[in-house]
Amino acid sequence: MSAFEDDSFVILNDDASESVPVSGSFDATDSFSAFDGSLQVEDSVDDVFAAPSSDYGAYSNGDGIFGSNGDHDGPILPPPSEMESDEGFALREWRRQNAIQLEEKEKREKELLKQIIEEADQYKEEFHKKIEVTCENNKAANREKEKLYLENQEKFYAESSKNYWKAIAELVPKEVPTIEKRRGKKEQQDPKKPTVSVIQGPKPGKPTDLTRMRQILVKLKHNPPSHLKLTSQPPSEEAAAPPKNVPETKPTEAVTAA
């Protein structure tokens, strides 16, 4: 038998001089066939899914490093507003320049707004003055036109009884548009000036149709009613008497006999 076939090994005690041989061979009689499971084995390993023990309750991220009080479970770091910002020189300079530019811009905007308001107030004053002057001029022109119109109306009604047809012709507006003659090249080059002036009718841009009125007036002129007929005045005595210093004409029979 070789030395490797021996399954025994030596256990050295604290004292190296003493050694105890131990047999490492397996005895078949020491099998587990006689184990019936009646022996209760205590489970010394903790259940990983069980609730943590109360012994670990004091360890939390509270006020202390290990949370000895266990009451507060807030953040460890202070809020960002209380933390000092670590800014570089370039960022601080940019913030300073930006604040100066914003302040200057706000001043310019206020000055511009003030200038716009002043110009608007001045424009409103000038506009109101211009409107007042225009209204006064229009009132004066309308008074002159009204005065002239009343004079023409009085004159028309005073002379209408003498000649009815003339009065009717004046009342009826002209149906045919009047063509205005232009003179000079400057007036011809002006396209805005109208060449034909049309009397406006009830609809803008269309002349009044007076055909029916003209037919009625022509019919009345040829067959006037009795109240429109002019009464013929009797001839006066001077008109009936023969004129003086006029030689008497001889009868034609006496002239032929002679």
Swiss-Prot record:
GO terms assigned for molecular function: identical protein binding; structural molecule activity
Function: Clathrin is the major protein of the polyhedral coat of coated pits and vesicles.
Bilayer topology annotation: Peripheral membrane protein
Basic and acidic residues: compositionally biased ranges: 177-193
Quaternary state and interactors: Clathrin coats are formed from molecules containing 3 heavy chains and 3 light chains. Interacts with TPLATE and CHC2.
GO BP field: intracellular protein transport; vesicle-mediated transport
Sorted UniProt keywords: Cell membrane, Coated pit, Coiled coil, Cytoplasm, Cytoplasmic vesicle, Cytoskeleton, Membrane
Location of the protein in the cell: Cell membrane; Cytoplasmic vesicle membrane; Membrane, Coated pit; Cytoplasm, Cytoskeleton, Phragmoplast
Keyword tRNA processing in annotation: no
Positions with biased composition (Low complexity): 234-243
Predominant location: membrane
Keyword Cell membrane annotated: yes
Chain spans, region Involved in binding clathrin heavy chain: 81-143
Protein name: Clathrin light chain 2
Domain of life of the source: Eukaryota
Coiled-coil ranges (or none): 91-156
Stretches for region Disordered: 61-85, 177-258
Tissue distribution: Expressed in root epidermal cells and root hairs (at the protein level).
GO annotations of cellular component type: cell plate; chloroplast envelope; clathrin coat of coated pit; clathrin coat of trans-Golgi network vesicle; cytoskeleton; Golgi apparatus; phragmoplast
